[in-house]
């Protein structure tokens, strides 16, 4: 089936789909305090979703393109779930968040199909994949339109990979007790087996959101990247997130001995946000298999155990947490009790001595991840490194931090 036909088949005009902000029915929804963080963006008044400009621009989206799509959403006079929130237009039509971002992605997909130059076509496919992922953001369970956008994002990503430098392999890994999971192995030029980074992404991202990390930071250092969707989303959607948050990644890590392109004696894990919960767990449970673990803005204890910190987090992020935990109808109190069990300190891991080298980067006054969180990680390691990342200029400092982190990983793998 062609890309155009797939888009038409998936996105037939319908108005019965539950709108994204209505999927999680939590009680005691409060007012939204202003909040901004480098990795998550900020909660802008009159928007349900956090507007994550840094990460979208880092993934290659032009700031003007973001504003253009936002303007189309704002200008819509279609029915909304909440008249006060622009991005809650009901149904797949003009003004709906998923519709507008998917429409933008389809324009790039069409350009990719018409482009004769393979490299340029690959770039356009990659851009289309990124925009489809933004359409599906924040990837709540049961969001049918978002799941269709994710399917198109994955297809576009596969098309891009065929045309861009290096090589990409789509791999299936068996996980006992449930469905297999699909991972993408990105390999730089040269002969393998390669030292490899196992990417553990945030809860509001897809595994295809990290190509920039591979292309700009890992591939130039001769390091491969293996990506995997977090439980309950994407290719891991049949798995619920549990207190054993690293279950899927752990089985994949063990299976790397059978992957000929990966040097299983030189593997590191890199965790963004809640992905750090997975990565640090692996540092304790699979120390012999990991040479190093790096974290960025980790969510391993404070946000999971401190009700006051949870009360400052935007509604969308609490909805993401509730969705991942399968608690679509939970009160905030029930959600807090459950989240506490995901703290690696409560689980008795963090605070114990860990032989795996661990690095953690943090921003001062990060509402999701205080400095103490990163200090707890690095002080628990027999070889810890702490990095403070200045907030402004946000993009340049983010790039500089990633260069420093990947240098540290390279030093331990190569």
Swiss-Prot record:
Domain of life per record: Bacteria
Molecular function terms, GO-annotated: carboxylesterase activity
InterPro entries (alphabetical): AB_hydrolase_fold, FrsA, FrsA-like, FrsA_esterase
Keyword Thylakoid assigned: no
Gene3D superfamilies per UniProt: alpha/beta hydrolase
Main EC class the enzyme belongs to: hydrolase
Keywords recorded for this protein, A-Z: Hydrolase, Serine esterase
Reactions the enzyme catalyzes: a carboxylic ester + H2O = an alcohol + a carboxylate + H(+)
EC number: 3.1.1.1
Record bears the keyword Acetylation: no
Pfam families: FrsA-like
HAMAP family membership: FrsA (MF_01063)
Function field: Catalyzes the hydrolysis of esters.
Family under the similarity heading: Belongs to the FrsA family.
Protein name: Esterase FrsA
High-level lineage: Bacteria, Pseudomonadati, Pseudomonadota, Gammaproteobacteria, Enterobacterales
Gene designation per UniProt: frsA
């Amino acid at each position: 089936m062609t890309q155009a036909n797939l888009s038409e088949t998936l996105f037939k005009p319908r108005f019965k789909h539950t709108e994204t902000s209505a999927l999680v029915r939590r009680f005691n929804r409060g007012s939204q305090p202003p909040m901004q963080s480098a990795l998550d963006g900020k909660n802008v008044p009159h928007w349900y979703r956090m507007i994550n400009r840094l990460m979208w621009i880092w993934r290659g989206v032009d700031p003007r393109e973001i504003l253009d799509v936002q303007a189309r959403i704002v200008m819509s006079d279609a029915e909304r779930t909440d008249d006060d929130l622009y991005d809650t237009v009901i149904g797949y039509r003009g003004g709906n968040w998923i519709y507008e971002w998917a429409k933008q992605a389809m324009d790039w997909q069409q350009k990719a199909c018409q482009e004769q130059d393979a490299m340029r076509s690959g770039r356009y496919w990659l851009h289309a994949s990124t925009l489809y992922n933004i359409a599906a953001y924040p990837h709540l369970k049961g969001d049918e339109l978002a799941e269709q956008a994710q399917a198109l994002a994955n297809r576009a990503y596969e098309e891009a990979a065929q045309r861009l430098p290096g090589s990409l392999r789509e791999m299936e890994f068996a996980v006992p007790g449930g469905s297999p999971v699909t991972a993408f192995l990105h390999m730089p030029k040269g002969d393998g087996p390669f030292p490899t980074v196992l990417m553990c992404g945030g809860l509001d991202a897809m595994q295809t959101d990290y190509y920039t990390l591979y292309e700009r930071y890992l591939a130039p250092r001769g390091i491969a990247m293996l990506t995997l969707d977090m439980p309950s989303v994407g290719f891991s959607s049949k798995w619920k997130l549990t207190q054993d948050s690293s279950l899927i990644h752990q089985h994949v890590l063990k299976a790397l001995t059978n992957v000929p392109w990966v040097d299983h004696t030189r593997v590191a894990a890199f965790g963004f946000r809640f992905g750090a919960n997975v990565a640090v767990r692996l540092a304790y449970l699979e120390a012999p298999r990991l040479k190093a673990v790096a974290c960025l803005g980790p969510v391993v204890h404070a946000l999971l155990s401190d009700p006051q910190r949870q009360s400052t987090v935007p509604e969308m992020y609490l909805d993401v947490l509730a969705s991942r935990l399968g608690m679509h109808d939970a009160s905030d109190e029930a959600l807090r009790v459950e989240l506490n069990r995901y703290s690696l300190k409560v689980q008795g891991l963090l605070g114990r001595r860990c032989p795996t080298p661990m690095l953690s980067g943090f921003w001062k006054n990060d509402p999701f991840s205080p400095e103490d969180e990163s200090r707890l990680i690095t002080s628990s390691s027999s070889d810890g490194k702490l990095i403070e990342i200045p907030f402004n200029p946000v993009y340049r400092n983010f790039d500089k931090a990633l260069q420093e982190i990947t240098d540290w990983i390279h030093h331990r793998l190569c």
